[in-house]
Amino acid sequence: MLKRTPLFDLYKEYGGKTIDFGGWELPVQFSSIKKEHEAVRTAAGLFDVSHMGEVEVSGNDSLSFLQRLMTNDVSALTPGRAQYTAMCYPDGGTVDDLLIYQKGENRYLLVINASNIDKDLAWMKEHAAGDVQIDNQSDQIALLAVQGPKAEAILKNLTDADVSALKPFAFIDEADISGRKALISRTGYTGEDGYEIYCRSDDAMHIWKKIIDAGDAYGLIPCGLGARDTLRFEAKLPLYGQELTRDITPIEAGIGFAVKHKKESDFFGKSVLSEQKENGAKRKLVGLEMIEKGIPRHGYEVFQNGKSVGKVTTGTQSPTLGKNVGLALIDSETSEIGTVVDVEIRKKLVKAKVVKTPFYKR
């Protein structure tokens, strides 16, 4: 039996087509992926992201515990601020990438990938020491994302909270949004400005409908996982299971900014990640643009002069560029912009070149 979010019953009303996404029955699209993608780039889109996991970490030793688990410097946070980070294994491979919200003194909300909830919880509990409480709140919290250049104007119609004053990665807790309480943060996974709204599961349907109504005049439409994927891909935001895995480090995946290897506290993977940060990693995530016809898909092998140099992690026809492009993890010596490589597509070698990323920047 596939898991469902609190908004499942609304999908059909908006024409949602569902798929199995890591054990969840979620909408891949409502209208078309291209239309939804373009709405987010030019106006606004509304996503149900309630499958994501939310875990509260509290207690007097919560900061030292998080510093040991996270690659970023959690001590830099203050209440009302969020941070993007990764958790790594001792060998530098990635457990997960996540957001940490500091809600108060010794109170943090961790937002983790849906497919990793059980694994992440087990990893955290295994390494918890001292006064640390780990509370999985995933079933009680729903998550909606309003993304796009019109997101701010839309939300201003629904809340008295000063959403326009929020800087990226800042949030307002216990904000009133159309009569319901929610945490509103200026974060997202699309490469656009936008907000993520964490509310009680019971309030999700009410808030969804209010956002749809308020957004109608601005061109907001409901969006599915398909557009979420093409949007994050163009912005070179990694997806766990593709750009980040047990065998790929945050440095290799291009999120070295979330690795503070000089922070005082020791953390899992520190020696490997420090070495990669100081001297460069052997592999690098690069952009590929096809020279010849074909789309570079996840898992396709990349060659140079007949030698395998890596694999495509994500690829598609970019709705914004109208070109067939991909992200690929390849040997660093073949990662220079302009380098010509071959992608194996249906047993044929097809020419591509290494290009600048991200493919899209607002």
Swiss-Prot record:
Keywords: Aminotransferase, Transferase. One of its GO terms (biological process) is glycine decarboxylation via glycine cleavage system. GO terms for molecular function: aminomethyltransferase activity; transaminase activity. One of its GO terms (cellular component) is cytosol. Belongs to the GcvT family. HAMAP family: GcvT. The glycine cleavage system catalyzes the degradation of glycine. This is Aminomethyltransferase. The lineage of its organism: Bacteria, Bacillati, Bacillota, Bacilli, Bacillales.
